[in-house]
Every structure is written in structure tokens, then in C-alpha cells.
Amino acid sequence: MVIPIRPLSPSLRKRTSGRFRQWSSRVTSGMVCLVRYSALCSLNTMQQLWKRFVLVV
């Protein structure tokens, strides 16, 4: 005898989706911060290298 698997109750599904959305938005914001930070760092190093290069030349 096969017991049909009932889908999750709507309230539970809503709660889990909300939590997932919150978590994903947090992760996305963290990624954006990381990307910005790395971009700033690379820009800084590029500027320093460029200044050194110009000074050498």
C-alpha cells in the first residue's frame, strides 16, 4: 500500500520561502560587499603600481 505524500502546508511553505529569501538576500549583499572591496583593493594596487611605474620612467 502506497501512502501519498502530502505537500507541505501553505503556512510552512510560506515561512520556509521567506526564510530562504531573507538568507539569499543576506548572501547577495555579502557578495556585493566582497566584490566592491576586492575591486577597491585592486584599484588601489593598480594606482600604486602605476605611480611607481611613472616614477621609474
Curated annotation (Swiss-Prot):
It comes from the Viruses. InterPro entries: DUF5466. Pfam families: DUF5466. This is Gene 19.3 protein. It comes from Enterobacteria phage T3 (Bacteriophage T3).
